[in-house]
Amino acid sequence: MLTIFIVTATLFAILYLYFTRNFNYWKDRNVVGPEPTVFFGNIMESVIRRKHLIMIYKDIYEAFPKEKVVGIYRMTTPCLLLRDLDVIKHVMIKDFDLFNDRGVEFSEEGLGLNIFHADGDRWRVLRQCFTPLFTSGKLKNMLNLMSDRGDKFIKMVEKICDKEPEQQIIPLVRKFTMASITTCAFGMELDEEMIETLDKLDSLIFTTSYGNEIDMMYPGILKKLNSSLFSKMIAPFFDNLTKTIIEQRGGKPTNRKDLMDLILELRQKKAIEPMKKTHDEQVTTLELTDSVIAAQTFIFYAAGYETSASTMSFLLFELAENPDIQEKVIAEVDETLKRHNGEITYDTLSEMTYLTQVFHETLRKYPVADILLRNAKADYAVPGTNVTLKKGQTVVVSGFGIHYDPKYYPDPEKFDPERFSPENVRNRHPCAYIPFGAGQRKCLGMRFGQWQVQVCIIKLLSKFRFEPSTKTMSEF
């Protein structure tokens, strides 16, 4: 019995020492931060799914208002949370070459080939390849597709609201974003079977797995094991969908000018390679295989569906809670559409400046890119501090923390579109507003996402006014 006790106690002692072995890392370097918990570090409430990680980082950001950087532990791994905007600008923009990896790469095949999760040379190639697809000139062709989906969406909403005017917004706008994304990406008309399939996939895509925590504790292990963060059902669906669409188009672009057309135009150029930085630099090339294309269409769908729907829901919630702002937006929508004969074009959107301010204020309060991560590619002396990051260490930026900092946004809980007047934007630090990220790894599809939200809001406000119901939550 005594032997069993000693063995058990020894085992627990070894485990305790192992899972706390790094917890003096920041203290030894005179970097302040919250006390870690055994095994979980500073993210225990996220691991047990009691609190979202974005709120944990926001709380840490707010707990150390005088610090430029804060030492934290993602599970047992020491990381640095950046608070100072100038430091963030150095990491995200000025010294980007040392921080161009997100550190979330999980596989070198299948869905892991997507531009969001890719790092290193693969990311550079993908970025150079796909950035031209998301310019205003290319995306203008998709506005007609969005507008057409919007018209069909409004007819559906009218039928629903004729029966019951009180509706939950998020399920409604998800119907629009699903239809918009699938037509703009794949040229698809949704039927009931496809809608049901996508609904099931959405729950799988947006269900958090514990793979993230494992990779936090053992950085890079998912890539080494070639293990996916996503359900095994997701990759075959996008692989089959991509192959089917490419076959239907004979492997060549059509005149639809949707995302698949633009990608097929790229594929006709064969292998893509990035520009060399130096004459002797090795160059990675990328062949646009069906698998590579499927990975990009997956991330385009995943990034554009739920984020746009959430943004629309929050925007409409704020308009319902602030009827004076809603009336101002409606007046601008009506006047602008009248000038453009009811058509939504690039010029139409450009002239709706107040709606654009409302959009940006919505993303300030409810940012899409809640957490920004970057990995140091070499030892790095953090500007304005005595802290040195070691190669491979991760920095964390809390978009929520910054967007709710009264130093940058007085009375941050208030919804105030005037924060994004041209004058206020000019006078604000460039890293004080980062809903889509910052620097060269900023979301490529942000313009598409903005237009998608604006088109839907314009269509809705042309027909409806929004009011809080008795079931509306006053806080999120």
UniProtKB/Swiss-Prot annotation:
Its EC number is 1.14.14.1. InterPro entries: Cyt_P450, Cyt_P450_CS, Cyt_P450_E_grp-I, Cyt_P450_sf, Insect_CytP450_Detox. This is Cytochrome P450 6B5. Pfam families: p450. Disulfide bonds: none annotated. Its main location: endoplasmic reticulum. It is a peripheral membrane protein. It catalyses: an organic molecule + reduced [NADPH--hemoprotein reductase] + O2 = an alcohol + oxidized [NADPH--hemoprotein reductase] + H2O + H(+). It comes from Papilio glaucus. One of its GO terms (molecular function) is heme binding. SUPFAM superfamilies: Cytochrome P450. It is found in: Endoplasmic reticulum membrane; Microsome membrane. Gene3D superfamilies: Cytochrome P450 (1.10.630.10). Belongs to the cytochrome P450 family. CDD domains: CYP6-like. Enables the insect to feed on furanocoumarin-producing plants and evolved as an adaptation for detoxification of xanthotoxin and other furanocoumarins. Heme binds at residue 443. Its cofactor is heme. It comes from the Eukaryota. Keywords: Endoplasmic reticulum, Heme, Iron, Membrane, Metal-binding, Microsome, Monooxygenase, Oxidoreductase. PROSITE patterns: CYTOCHROME_P450. Induction: By furnocoumarin. One of its GO terms (cellular component) is endoplasmic reticulum membrane.
